[in-house]
Each structure stands twice: as C-alpha cells, then as structure tokens.
Amino acid sequence: MYKLTRFQYPRDRSVGDSQVLTTEINVAAIELIDAGGRIGLGFAQSLFSVLPDSAEIERIFLEQAWPGLEGKLPSALALAVRRPRGGNVRRMTLPFEEAIQQAVWDLLAQQQGVPLWQMLGAERQSVPAYASGLDFHLSDHAFSELFGNAAEQGYRGFKIKVGHPELERDLHRLNLLRQAVGPERPVMIDPNEAWNAQQAIDALAIFERAGHRIFWVEDPVPRDDIDGLKMIRRLGVTRVNAGEYLDLSGKRRLLEQRACDMLNVHAQVGDVMRAGWLASEHNVEVTLGNSFLEIGVNMALALPGVRWLEYSFQNFDHLVEETFPIRDGMIFGSDRPGHGLRLSAGAEQACRAIAAAGAATAVTAA
C-alpha cells in the first residue's frame, strides 16, 4: 500500500542563489506501507513550481511509479541494478525518484530492526555540519543575523552564495560573514555555475588578496565544463567541490577526469552509496549537500571520510515527529529503525496554519 500527502506553504525567508529564487515550499510525502504496517517515508520536493492537486499527484504516481513498486520486496527494490535504455531513460513527471529511494531504504532498515546508518555500515553516530545560508537574496542584515546565530550554535563551517554580476558584492558578503562568524572557521563559496573558469580564477585571487582563505568553491562553472573545473583545480588555491547537478553516470565521468577534489552528493540513498564507492576508488572526498530534513546524515555516517554535511535552516521541521539532533555543530543519526524520520500527525494542520499566517501578513502589508 501507499499514501501520498501534499504540502504547500510559504517559506520563512527567501531561499536562492545566483540563478534561482524560491519563496514557497511544495512537497509531497510518499509513504510505502508493508504487510506488517511498517511505513517507509520519502519526500518529493518541487523547488520552482506548484505541485498539482492531490488527485493528480496520485494519478501520476499510480501510473508512473506504483507499477514498479507493487508487490516487490524493499530489498529487491533497494539493491536491484537497472540499465534503462532508449525512451526508458527519462524522469517521471513529478520528482518521485529520490523520494522512492528514501522510502524503500527506510522500509528495508525498519524490517531489519536497525537504523539505516547502521545497516549501511556506519561505525560512528555523528558528522560535522556546516551552515549554509541559501542567502543570495537576503538583505545584509538578515545575512549577518543568520550566520551570527549559526556561529553561536557551534556550526563548524559556513557556506555563502556568490556569483553576483558585481564581484564587489561577493567580496562585501565575505567581509560580512567574517564579521559574523570570526576569523578561524572554514568558509566555503557557491556560485552555482555563474562563472567561467577564468572568472572563477580571478574571483578566487581577489578574495585571497582581500584576506579570505576559501575552503572550497562549489560548482564554479557549468556542470559539463570538465576542462574548466580542471583548470581551477590545478591552481591549488582551494578545493573544487562539484557533482551536485550530475547523475551517477555524470559523477563517474567527473571522477575519471580528476576534475574535483570533493564529490557533492544528496539524498538518493542507493545512488549516493554507489557514488561514494566510486569516489573512494579515486581517493576523492565526499560531501553531503542539502537533503530534505537532513536525511542524508545516514549516508554521511556510512561513507568513509565524509567530513561535512550541509544544513540550511529551512522551515521543514514541523512535517516530522522528530528531526536529527544537532549539538555543537555535529549532526547525529537517529536511534530508531529506518532513516529516522516519521511524518507528523499534525503536519497538514501546521502547514495550513503557516499558509494562513502568511496570507494574513500579505493582506496586512497590502
């Protein structure tokens, strides 16, 4: 069996980068239910468009996703190796793929009676988290407040969005960040493919002359510019973190070309573990980028040498009964069987309240 739940409500701040901006959350929770009543949970997020109504979401799921799931063992779904060809190499109409992986692996770990991170082979229970602002469109005041609070909470590193048409603005933000968090902890930058290789090299040189040592630059050039990534990497002034926008095959090519120092992965459980194996074969460090409600902590704990997981202060917490604990800049795996997240019984009501409050604020402001 399965259950789908649609959520739509405003964000508590603008979220975006040099390329995109979003002010609303549109999510579908997918619950896969086995014969014993255990529930595997996954989240399908539409970042830039409103999801259709619940009936249409279910129609698409029933037509495109459910035939491949119905009657299958979670272990078979999790471990199967597929090689689609021709017209079968395509995405579903709605972004169900990652959510299905999350739900399947959650259900499999529950059936084994262990936390997912333990089932994946982890020998530690916590990993450092860095504070990520998704801050390109924030005011200077909101930017400084966000990172100042993150520093007080003990986060181990800080990543800001850069790639503004005026490089002076990026430099200004780096100056503000250092004022907010102090001089010692690592700083990362993410232009979200805003530059070409020479622009990235020039920007890094300007930042360095201004006294900013950059721990990594993330996706500095378009994802298919392998030669550009290699140019930046050869300079040796900072680490190149790449791979966020690539599927597993693209990540393999990135590693084979020695085009990154760090491979960025997210929350497709099986794909992340395979990518982690490939990265280990090439002696490349893995970093966990944004994953919905930090579900990626399970893979971060299990993969060798992962030192960083991204935390970006998004208002998702009310959707689940309990989030992953974060203390002194360390995020911990859950002790409960599965990946650790359970949909809150009050999630729909909480989202309606947030949406109503947002509408009231908008009317008042008008």
Regions found by a protein language model. Name each.
Residues 133-144, 163-167:
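Active-site beta->alpha loop and helix N-cap motifs at the rims of alpha/beta catalytic domains
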Residues 112-135:
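N-terminal small/glycine-rich loop or linker at the start of catalytic domains
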Residues 30, 37, 100, 113, ...:
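Conserved, mostly hydrophobic/aromatic
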Residues 33-111:
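Metal- or metallocofactor-binding catalytic centers and their adjacent structured scaffolds
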Residues 7-9, 291-366:
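Flexible C-terminal active-site loop/helix
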Residues 149-161:
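Catalytic domains of carbohydrate-active enzymes, especially glycoside hydrolases
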Residues 160, 165-290, 299, 326:
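Catalytic core of soluble alpha/beta enzymes
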Residues 1-50, 317:
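Structured beta-strand/loop patches that form or line metal/cofactor-binding pockets in enzymes
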